[in-house]
Swiss-Prot record:
GO biological process: activation-induced cell death of T cells; immune response; motor neuron apoptotic process; necroptotic signaling pathway; negative regulation of apoptotic process; regulation of stress-activated MAPK cascade
GO terms under cellular component: CD95 death-inducing signaling complex; external side of plasma membrane; membrane raft
Domain comment quoted from the record: Contains a death domain involved in the binding of FADD, and maybe to other cytosolic adapter proteins.
Organism domain of life: Eukaryota
TNFR-Cys repeat copies, ranges: 47-83, 84-127, 128-166
GO MF entries: calmodulin binding; tumor necrosis factor receptor activity
Protein name: Tumor necrosis factor receptor superfamily member 6
Function: Receptor for TNFSF6/FASLG. The adapter molecule FADD recruits caspase CASP8 to the activated receptor. The resulting death-inducing signaling complex (DISC) performs CASP8 proteolytic activation which initiates the subsequent cascade of caspases (aspartate-specific cysteine proteases) mediating apoptosis. FAS-mediated apoptosis may have a role in the induction of peripheral tolerance, in the antigen-stimulated suicide of mature T-cells, or both.
Pfam family, one: Death
Interaction with HIPK3 as annotated region, ranges: 211-315
Complex and partners: Component of the death-induced signaling complex (DISC) composed of cell surface receptor FAS/CD95, adapter protein FADD and the CASP8 protease; recruitment of CASP8 to the complex is required for processing of CASP8 into the p18 and p10 subunits. Interacts directly (via DED domain) with NOL3 (via CARD domain); inhibits death-inducing signaling complex (DISC) assembly by inhibiting the increase in FAS-FADD binding induced by FAS activation. Binds DAXX. Interacts with HIPK3. Part of a complex containing HIPK3 and FADD. Binds RIPK1 and FAIM2. Interacts with BABAM2 and FEM1B.
Amino acid sequence: MLGIWTLLPLVLTSVVRLLSKCVNAQVTDISSKGFELRKIVTTIETQNLEGLHHEGQFCRNPCPPGERKARDCTVNEDEPDCVPCQEGEEYTDKGHFSSKCRRCRLCDEGHGLEVEINCTRTQNTKCRCKPNFFCNSAVCEHCDPCTKCKHGIIEECTLTSNTKCKEEDSRSDLLWLCLLLLLLLIPPIVYVVIKEPCRKRRKENQGPHESTTLNPETAINLSDVDLSKYITTIAGAMTLSQVKDFVRKNGVSEAKIDEIKNDNVQDTAEQKVQLLRNWYQLHGKKDACDTLIKGLKTADLCTLAEKIHAVILKDITSDTENSNFGNEVQNLV
């Protein structure tokens, strides 16, 4: 009986040791299986990075750029069934396992963009700024309008930079001042250019004899000279349009002008004579010569006015000298 109690601790110790070995063996087996599982997962992940994708079954290769997967692979490491993306609306620019293509980018005109390169199955749309717009960022989602310069441009606006404008300075004020002075000086300059030739020609046509020998009585008679004997000479020195313009401005009616024209359709010389005679009859003898000379000068016909004035003045001077000579002869008798 004593021997049994002595052997019992030994038996229990052996059982405990045996159980411990079994547990250790199971733990070791579980650890080994966990390691193998991790190895498998790592292998799968590595294969995924190399182009395998698992959706039901493994596909060995991705769909090429411009295509998408139409269905999953039915056999491990099978080739995928790929179909093209929709041209102009979708694209893929690299190999992939997706069943969808990417949507093409839209170039929003409202944001200052326009299409530079159209979208294809393998390339997205490329946008750029519209004319008179710019974008200075790396990725342009919108473009800004170019600045309009009021005082001049230093650098023109480009696709990537805004316009550089000149600043307003005192030179612009000086320019406006010079322009204003020029506008003020133009009228007197034009007046001198137009009127000075008339004044010079008047001095040239007035000889020394005319300026010194005429007495006050001759000057008075010039304003009351009878133009009837000079009408033909005056008409010959003027064009028909000049005669019409003069008589029209000095009281001859359009009806009378047309009547004289119709009466002398084929003879323009006679038209001029009759028009001047009609004007002279309406005006009368008094101051008719002055009216004629002033009217021609007003119409910028200075040369013609001086020529007619010289002819009449010379004729009056000659008549005066002849009259004086006749009086001297009578006194001698």
